[in-house]
């Protein structure tokens, strides 16, 4: 029992490792379709449901088959005619089990899908607990949760009723076998081909046949739940990786001399282009500001540079090499990302700053924090750099979160920086500290910044105004203001808003 349990634990651990690794490398659109609840459901619930599958699918049936072979041998040695009568049960059992599997496994598959939806909803509820409480949504969330759980319960009870039918049918088959043995044994006795003792002994030994057959049927019944969960696990394992390296892929150069986007086209869905005919050459160390209204394609451009997606047309060249001909790992080593909505992990301040540099020393972490103007507030925290900041950094203010994200990017020391500037309004002191740390972050790096603040845009070497995925204007701030086009109109509107105290200096 210990060895079987140990084997189960090792198999489940290997399965979890393989599944987690595959999930880490799935294309982003697939992950977005699965949702967090679906991912957690497969990693935990589905694999937990398969615990003991090896025992059920291999060990128990193997033991039952050995017992079945021994029983058949004994029965044949006693009376081959009666043995054939008893063996007639096996085709009926096989047919009954196949019918049961066809009807029950879809139910269990549906149960796992419903459980996934419930897990996802629970995750959303507690991620947005402020909204739930502010809008008095607790009764609705409780009702939705219980409705989902009752649906799962009804389906499980329905499947269990099907199992009861299977067990009842098995009882009828056993009774039929006993009746057949007595009836046919009586015929053999009257014909002088069997004694009463033979018939009684045969009837007793027939249980040696029926018990392993029943064990196989029972195992087959229990197996359906595990197989439904296992199918969902292997469905993910069978998915293709995000971007496997091309044959002959080479390591990325360590210094960025030029990044060129050449005839770039991209669409999430066929026939709906998001980026069209994008051409731009970015010398190393250049700061490129992407501006434009919401939905213009700014984030998609930065996602293409980061290779979160590959273009559907055109190519991106790093020092003249198509980035798809570089190993993804070495290319991503050149990158750092600062998102508009800062993402911090539920760990210590130091762990979050060093996330991109696992070999960083405490001195490295503190130096990055100082350059991001974060050191002073960090040392005032209860445990300093070892203070745990909660899931998504909920124990920190918005300005503190942004400075930690900047410190993380500074410590990563990237050649290429992708910055989606935060649009949230901050107090004057936080705004000034962040702007000062931004100057350190951008210095000497090839940077693509989705810019919202005029101060950041003015700092850019090249400004691209995007509209419906196309670059409609390009140049420096001075050049575009002199051209008095769409960029000029945006800046004027922003300055008028600032004059009336609107938006807090955020360029919309």
Where are the regions a protein language model picked out?
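Helix-loop-helix
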Residues: 74-88, 158, 162-231, 236-237
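ABC-type nucleotide-binding domain
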Residues: 245, 252-508
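Membrane-embedded alpha-helical segments of multi-pass transporters/permeases
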Residues: 2, 68, 72, 76, ...
């Amino acid at each position: 029992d210990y060895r079987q349990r140990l084997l189960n634990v090792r198999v489940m651990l290997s399965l979890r490792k393989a599944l987690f690794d595959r999930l880490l490398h799935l294309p982003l659109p697939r992950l977005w379709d699965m949702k967090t609840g679906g991912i957690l459901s497969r990693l935990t619930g589905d694999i937990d449901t398969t615990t003991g599958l090896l025992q059920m699918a291999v060990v128990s049936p193997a033991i039952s088959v050995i017992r079945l072979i021994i029983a058949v041998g004994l029965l044949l040695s006693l009376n081959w005619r009666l043995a054939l009568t008893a063996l007639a049960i096996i085709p009926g059992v096989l047919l009954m089990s196949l019918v049961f599997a066809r009807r029950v496994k879809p139910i269990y598959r549906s149960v796992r899908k419903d459980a996934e939806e419930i897990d996802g909803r629970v995750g959303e509820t507690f991620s947005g607990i402020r909204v739930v409480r502010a809008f008095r949504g607790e009764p609705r969330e409780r009702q939705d949760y219980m409705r989902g759980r009752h649906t799962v319960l009804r389906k499980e009870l329905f499947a269990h009723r099907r199992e009861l039918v299977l067990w009842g049918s098995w009882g009828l088959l056993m009774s039929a076998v006993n009746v057949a043995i007595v009836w046919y044994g009586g015929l053999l006795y009257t014909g002088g081909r069997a004694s009463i003792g033979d018939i009684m002994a045969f009837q007793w030994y027939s249980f040696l046949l029926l018990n392993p057959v029943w064990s196989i049927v029972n195992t087959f019944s229990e197996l359906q739940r595990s197989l439904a969960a296992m199918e969902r696990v292997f469905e993910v394992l069978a998915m293709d990786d995000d971007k496997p390296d091309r044959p002959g892929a080479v390591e990325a150069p360590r210094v960025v001399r030029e990044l060129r986007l050449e005839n770039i086209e991209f669409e999430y869905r066929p026939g709906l282009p998001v980026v069209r005919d994008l051409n731009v050459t970015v010398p190393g160390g250049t700061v490129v500001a992407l501006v434009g209204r919401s939905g213009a394609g700014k984030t998609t451009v930065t996602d293409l540079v980061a290779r979160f997606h590959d273009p559907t047309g055109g190519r991106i060249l790093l020092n003249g090499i198509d980035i798809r001909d570089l190993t993804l790992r070495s290319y991503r080593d050149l990158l750092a990302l600062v998102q508009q909505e800062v993402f911090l992990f539920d760990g210590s301040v130091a762990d979050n700053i060093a996330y991109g540099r696992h070999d960083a020393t405490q001195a490295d972490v503190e130096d990055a924090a100082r350059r991001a103007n974060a050191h002073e507030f960090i040392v005032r925290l209860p445990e300093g750099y070892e203070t745990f900041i909660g899931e998504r950094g909920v124990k920190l203010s918005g300005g503190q979160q942004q400075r930690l994200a900047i410190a993380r990017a500074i410590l990563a020391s990237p050649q290429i920086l992708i910055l989606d500037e935060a649009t949230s309004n901050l107090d004057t002191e936080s705004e000034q500290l962040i702007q000062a740390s931004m100057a350190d972050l951008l210095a000497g790096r090839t940077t693509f910044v989705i810019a919202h603040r005029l101060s950041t845009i003015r700092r850019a070497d090249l400004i691209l105004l995007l509209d419906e995925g196309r670059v409609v204007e390009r140049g420096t701030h001075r050049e575009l203001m002199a051209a008095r086009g769409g960029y000029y109109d945006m800046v004027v509107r922003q300055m008028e808003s600032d004059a009336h105290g609107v938006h807090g200096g955020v360029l919309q």
